[in-house]
Amino acid sequence: MRIKHLLLLSILLLVFAVSCDGQAMVEGEDSLCVASWNVQNLFNAVLDGSEYDEYKPSAGWSQSAYESRLSNASKVLGYLPSATSYIVVLNEIENPNVVEDLIKIGDISKIGFHFYACAGMDGGAIQTAVVSSIPIKGARIHSVSDDQRPILEVEFDTSYGKLFILAVHFKSNIGGQSETAVKRVESASVVRQISRQIQKENPGCLVLVCGDMNEECWDENSMGRFEYSDCPLKVSDTFLRDSWYCFWLDQNLGLWPGGSYMYNEEWKCYDNILVSQAGKDGTGWEYNSCGIVFEGIIKTADQRPFSWDRSLLRGVSDHLPVWVTFFPSV
């Protein structure tokens, strides 16, 4: 079925939902795992015209290469911690057809991804998707500017209260970190506006901002530390009113490895899941744990992400999935 969506400015955006057969990974106590992963340019072998040149059949991109990438992606998603329900944000996925192919793969079909929503700019090569084992109540797409990826808002009505996912993919640093910083601030400002409206209309709801933000939470640009920041998204290592809990700031966790993306031999904490104060308010879904998927086929022998290499047709992704888990309050 088609999910209700909001269309702003002249950007044509798409959102879909699909039902398919499947069941939850584990049974017993209710639990929720929310994850975010930039899959690094996951394209099928069908020519749509908007692909990057290297993913066109004329460049040698094939169905077998596509299926290999699907298989690897599904294996990595299978490394997520066991839960009774799952919501996963995927960046850099081509279109809804690729989402459908991915969630039907054997390694993750047992998770029970019944629903999904996608958003992207008209003519853009990649989209952001939210896949879920929980029914999607509604989805809206919020434009940022003509040359920026939209914000995908997805609403869930669970047994433990309302949950909203704001799926993002902020502007990359291509062109210079400082030169592109204003674009990430623009996106973060839209996220702030959306989240405030959501919380005003749904007091006590849980809101999560998930995706590749292309900068770190202490960079004092789109995000900044709650105590003294004027940034659009104020973050903290604990759950405070009018701020977002950011696990990258929580030094008590000792997360390994030290980031989700490696650039110039340095770990970067670009992929994020920001949790609203409702994640620790004693009601509904309560934050439990967090982590980074760094095992199996996504980890190289020298402790790096096994990046996808189009020329060699090998690898998985240059980003690692990050995740948080929740349990219902007792």
PLM regions: where:
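Structured beta-strand-rich core segments of catalytic domains in phosphoester-bond hydrolases
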Residues: 39, 93-171
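Bacterial N-terminal signal peptides that target proteins for export
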Residues: 1-7
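Active-site beta-strand/loop signature of hydrolases that rely on acidic residues for catalysis
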Residues: 34-39, 73-100, 165, 191-224, ...
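Second-shell loop/turn segments in exported
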Residues: 57-64, 84-90, 118, 141, ...
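N-terminal, active-site-proximal structural segment of metallo-dependent hydrolase catalytic domains
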Residues: 18-105, 120-121, 304, 308-310, ...
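Metal-dependent phosphoester-hydrolase catalytic domains
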Residues: 20-24, 197-207, 215-330
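Bacterial N-terminal signal peptides
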Residues: 8-17
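Active-site His/acidic residue clusters
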Residues: 50, 166-180
